[in-house]
From Swiss-Prot:
<feature type="region of interest" description="Disordered">
    <location>
        <begin position="1"/>
        <end position="115"/>
    </location>
</feature>
<dbReference type="GO" id="GO:0045944">
    <property type="term" value="P:positive regulation of transcription by RNA polymerase II"/>
</dbReference>
<keyword id="KW-0227">DNA damage</keyword>
<dbReference type="GO" id="GO:1905168">
    <property type="term" value="P:positive regulation of double-strand break repair via homologous recombination"/>
</dbReference>
<protein>
    <recommendedName>
        <fullName>Mortality factor 4-like protein 2</fullName>
    </recommendedName>
</protein>
<dbReference type="GO" id="GO:0005730">
    <property type="term" value="C:nucleolus"/>
</dbReference>
<keyword id="KW-0341">Growth regulation</keyword>
<keyword id="KW-0805">Transcription regulation</keyword>
<feature type="domain" description="MRG">
    <location>
        <begin position="117"/>
        <end position="288"/>
    </location>
</feature>
<dbReference type="GO" id="GO:0035267">
    <property type="term" value="C:NuA4 histone acetyltransferase complex"/>
</dbReference>
<dbReference type="InterPro" id="IPR008676">
    <property type="entry name" value="MRG"/>
</dbReference>
<dbReference type="Pfam" id="PF05712">
    <property type="entry name" value="MRG"/>
</dbReference>
<keyword id="KW-0234">DNA repair</keyword>
<keyword id="KW-0539">Nucleus</keyword>
<dbReference type="InterPro" id="IPR038217">
    <property type="entry name" value="MRG_C_sf"/>
</dbReference>
<dbReference type="InterPro" id="IPR026541">
    <property type="entry name" value="MRG_dom"/>
</dbReference>
<feature type="compositionally biased region" description="Polar residues">
    <location>
        <begin position="1"/>
        <end position="15"/>
    </location>
</feature>
Length: 288
């Protein structure tokens, strides 16, 4: 009797573990995260108390949705052996359940529900900045003007001023650490995304000229506020593919929205149509 009870308990535990891997629900992700936090106290000691461990490292980290594949394989092997140890079921029935479960338990495949939820990541642009996005589009695409480069105040300078502003407000150390990480992440995303996602077609010849004139300079040292604002229209789609869990993503969005409020507060000095100039006839020919 005791051996049968143990076998039954083993099957129940293994089935529960296997279900956790198959269904990356929010509750399972949270439980996985809690287990990881308990086992990594040494590393957690160096992190700020109010930050999720996934936020440092420029908004990256290991996702709770992708457990090590070795854990899954071990669970499956035990599951196959269990029926033979208990009630003496026929051997022809043993291979059938694992075959069905192998197709569904692949830890590298994200569920449709989880994918759709990630596609819903949105960064809210303050109402004060939306008219400027429209004017920026009109100046470039309809009036055929170009933002003058290098910018009078580049992206690096804007981010540095924001970081200094937050630090001057007397924030505690862990808050200051978070601001540095967010500012660094914005800069990295800007430099990666500018050439492929943040330019209008009419601006591409100008971008090519900048690359020739400043081959070693990051674009955050060349471009300014209008292109930085465009980043926040696009960045939500990129964040949907980061390995941040729900808590870390919500924390990050809070910091991004705080930065956008800073841009809105200083919009009069950061956004002005006088920074644009009508493109020459020669440039028009290049842009065709």
């Amino acid at each position: 009797m005791s051996s049968r009870k143990q076998a039954s308990q083993t099957r129940g535990q293994q089935s529960a573990e296997e279900d956790n891997f198959k269904k990356p629900t929010r509750s399972n992700m949270q439980r996985s995260k809690m287990r990881g936090a308990a086992s990594g106290k040494k590393s957690a000691g160096s992190q700020p108390k109010n930050l999720d461990p996934a936020l440092p490292g420029r908004w990256g980290g290991r996702s709770a949705e992708n457990p090590p594949s070795g854990s899954v394989r071990k669970t499956r092997k035990n599951k196959q052996k269990t029926p033979g140890n208990g009630d003496g079921g026929s051997t022809s029935e043993v291979p059938q359940p694992p075959r069905k479960k192998r197709a569904r338990a692949d830890p590298t495949v994200e569920s449709e529900e989880a994918f759709k939820s990630r596609m819903e990541v949105k960064v809210k642009i303050p109402e004060e900045l939306k008219p400027w996005l429209v004017e920026d589009w009109d100046l470039v695409t309809r009036q055929k003007q170009l933002f003058q480069l290098p910018a009078k105040k580049n992206v690096d300078a804007i981010l540095e001023e924001y970081a200094n502003c937050k630090k001057s407000q007397g924030n505690v150390d862990n808050k200051e650490y978070a601001v540095n990480e967010v500012v660094g992440g914005i800069k990295e995303y800007f430099n990666v995304m500018l050439g492929t996602q943040l330019l209008y077609k009419f601006e591409r010849p100008q971008y090519a000229e900048i690359l020739l004139a400043h081959p070693d300079a990051p674009m955050s040292q060349i471009y300014g506020a209008p292109h930085l604002l465009r980043l926040f229209v696009r960045i939500g789609a990129m964040l949907a593919y980061t390995p941040l869990d729900e808590k870390s993503l919500a924390l990050l969005l809070g910091y991004l929205h705080d930065f956008l409020k800073y841009l809105a507060k200083n919009s009069a000095s950061l956004f002005t149509a006088s920074d644009y100039k009508v493109a020459s006839a020669d440039y028009h020919r290049k842009a065709l």
